[in-house]
């Protein structure tokens, strides 16, 4: 799913670049051959969200596939750097609207690609489902932004529906996992992994060996497995799948 989201973001970047270099084909120029300022704003916002979605989804895909470490990656001043990049994108969007410069356009793309990486790397693997849902929302808003540039009503409607539903789902998932929705958007809650269970530290811990689990499974007539936050923290989804396959065979 994360890989598909990356393609949506990349497509938004390509469409925005095509509209910028051949505006006449998209009907977004005035009688003097200049691109409408409103189209430049829509283009810059769409390409920024698309680029963030692309690199963010790639990082999420690599973490979920185990190709890179799922542990949060943080460094000093990370949030200040993210804030600086965000403010820089706003300033560049204003400059791009006034000057319509190719250099500024690709600078927006470059900074957005970097911001997409920085937003996702501090998030732990256990919280990736929320990240994927949020990236789904980003891809929807990227599509909607390009829809405004192309004056495509269908793209605007579908993109808005995907963006809104993804944001709502992310909020619900954050509430269920005792996470801050704002922290998800800002990409800074991965280092807090495990804090959601601190209030339950006084409860009795039930331990068991693999032999105990095997004995219970072998004598059970039916088994219901409910994946939860603990499975995500332990990154046990692959082992759970293997166990389910073996249970079905026997």
PLM region spans:
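Membrane-interfacial segments at transmembrane helix termini in multi-pass membrane proteins
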Residues: 161-220
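Structured cytosolic domains appended to multi-pass membrane proteins
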Residues: 199-250
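Structured alpha-helical segments in the cores of large, soluble enzyme domains
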Residues: 110, 114-117, 141-145, 209-215
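Acidic, glycine-enriched active-site microenvironments
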Residues: 1-129, 134-137, 155, 160, ...
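Interfacial segments of multi-pass membrane proteins
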Residues: 134-151
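Generic hydrophobic alpha-helical scaffold/packing signal
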Residues: 132, 145, 158-161, 174, ...
């Amino acid at each position: 799913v994360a890989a598909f989201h990356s393609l949506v973001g990349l497509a938004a970047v390509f469409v925005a670049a095509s509209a910028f270099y051949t505006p006449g084909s998209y009907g977004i120029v005035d009688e003097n051959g200049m691109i409408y300022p409103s189209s430049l704003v829509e283009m810059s916002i769409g390409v920024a969200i698309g680029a963030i979605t692309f690199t963010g989804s790639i990082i999420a895909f690599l973490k979920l596939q185990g190709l890179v470490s799922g542990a949060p990656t943080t460094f000093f001043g990370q949030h200040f750097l993210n804030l600086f990049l965000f403010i820089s994108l706003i300033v560049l969007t204003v400059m791009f609207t006034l000057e319509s410069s190719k250099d500024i356009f690709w600078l927006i793309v470059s900074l957005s690609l970097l911001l997409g990486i920085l937003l996702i790397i501090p998030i732990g693997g256990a919280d990736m489902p929320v990240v994927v849902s949020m990236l789904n929302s980003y891809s929807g808003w990227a599509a909607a932004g390009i829809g405004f540039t192309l004056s495509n009503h269908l793209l605007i409607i579908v993109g808005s529906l995907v963006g809104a539903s993804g944001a709502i789902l992310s909020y619900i998932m954050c509430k269920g996992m005792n996470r801050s929705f704002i922290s998800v958007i800002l990409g800074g809650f991965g280092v807090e992994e495990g804090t959601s269970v601190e209030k339950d530290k006084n409860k009795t811990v039930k331990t068991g060996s693999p032999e105990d689990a095997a004995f219970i499974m072998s004598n059970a007539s039916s088994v219901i497995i409910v994946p939860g936050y603990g499975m995500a923290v332990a990154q046990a989804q692959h082992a759970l799948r293997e166990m389910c396959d073996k249970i079905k065979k026997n």
